[in-house]
Amino acid sequence: MQTSPLLENLIESLRCLPGVGPKSAQRMAYHLLQRDRSGGMNLARALTEAMSKIGHCEHCRTFTEEDICSICDNPRRQNSRLLCVVEMPADIQAIEQTGQFSGRYFVLMGHLSPLDGIGPREIGLDLLQRRLQQEQFNEVILATNPTVEGDATANYIAELCNQQNIKVSRIAHGIPVGGELETVDGTTLTHSFLGRRTIG
């Protein structure tokens, strides 16, 4: 049976989402068309608006509709001498929910992965280095994921910090090896922050 080109395009477009294969995309498309057209229209509007209006914070690189995000724009945060480096914006959300950190952030938007062509510049380490030189941080907390790539990224950043005599630590126990911050519960993440250790 020949299907509608518009339907095929919808199914194919839904496959761009992580973990969504052909069957899942097809189920989603049929659900929206059969049972939830208003939800589909709301989704389309929200996607269009988000894609056109959400950019990156000029200071920390997280997602925001403004030039500077609400965390970086907070006067209490601006005086903090603690900088937490994370891989993704979702990691900030996870850390903020613990209430254990009141410093500033820097988002890498990934991790070092030479085999995939992702080097220091691709994850903004040149911007991080400039920020470390321009601002007076007492400590940099590395909250990269406990993966091989996360470890390599943390070690690289630790070297940058050591060159500038900035104390550097990494969140420690509680996060499973191979896990990702955005999926860890708040209690575990709290223990990880309290148990961070110095590197170098």
UniProtKB/Swiss-Prot annotation:
GO terms for molecular function: DNA binding; zinc ion binding. The keyword Zinc-finger applies. Keywords: DNA damage, DNA recombination, DNA repair, Metal-binding, Zinc, Zinc-finger. CDD domains: TOPRIM_recR (cd01025). Belongs to the RecR family. Residues 81-176 form the Toprim domain. A zinc finger (C4-type) spans 57-72. Gene3D superfamilies: 3.40.1360.10, 6.10.250.240, RecR Domain 1. It holds the Pfam family Toprim_4. This is Recombination protein RecR. One of its GO terms (biological process) is DNA repair. May play a role in DNA repair. It seems to be involved in an RecBC-independent recombinational process of DNA repair. It may act with RecF and RecO. InterPro entries: DNA_Rcmb_RecR (IPR000093), Rcmb_RecR (IPR023627), Rcmb_RecR_Znf (IPR015967), TOPRIM_dom (IPR006171), TOPRIM_RecR (IPR034137).
